Amino acid sequence: MIDGSHHPYQKNIEETRKVVEYAHKYDVTVEGELGVLAGIEDDVVAAKSVYTQPEEVEDFVKKTGVDSLAISIGTSHGANKFKPEQCTKNSEGVLIPPPLRFDILEEIERRIPGFPIVLHGASSVPAELVKMINTYGGKMKDAVGIPEEQLRKAAKSAVCKINIDSDGRLAMTAAVRKALVDNPAEFDPRKYLGPARDLLKELYKLKIINVLGSNNKG
């Protein structure tokens, strides 16, 4: 994976092509990125998202030689993917994020049919995990992610990989906080990391089977 999306377009092509040329010598595939996701990843900070421009994808793929392409259609990094003012609220006051730009994805599919597409920043930020963290001393406010029904739709398209990281962090943090509050005298990491591991495993099991539809496809 080489993310040059924070560079100007031509610089992104140049940097990505260098990685591709080196990696392909060793039969290593390379994922490039076009379009910017808001948030922080690997010390790269972006204040706001910039949607992928479909008219650039053919040129980018051809000139870089990447094997897959991460695009920006409304996902973003972290557990606070959208500001409250970007969302609506349901009858219970729960923040509802804006929908993903599937029109952009469909146009990209039309321009580079069959090419593997990737989505980063696709955690759904489960409300029950946020509540669990806050119940046991956390202070997470206005956390909101990508609805799972939208991820299911994406998984049925040309999207071959969907990155989900923050949900795993939430699961582990929630389990550790609960374990330490329930057992304040505990100091053996095995006693609180064990529950964290179990909840993490259950989370990704549900994602693989119920959201991504990728079970038995390894």
Roles of regions detected by a PLM:
Residues N134-Y136, I146-G218:
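C-terminal alpha-helical cap/extension of soluble enzyme domains
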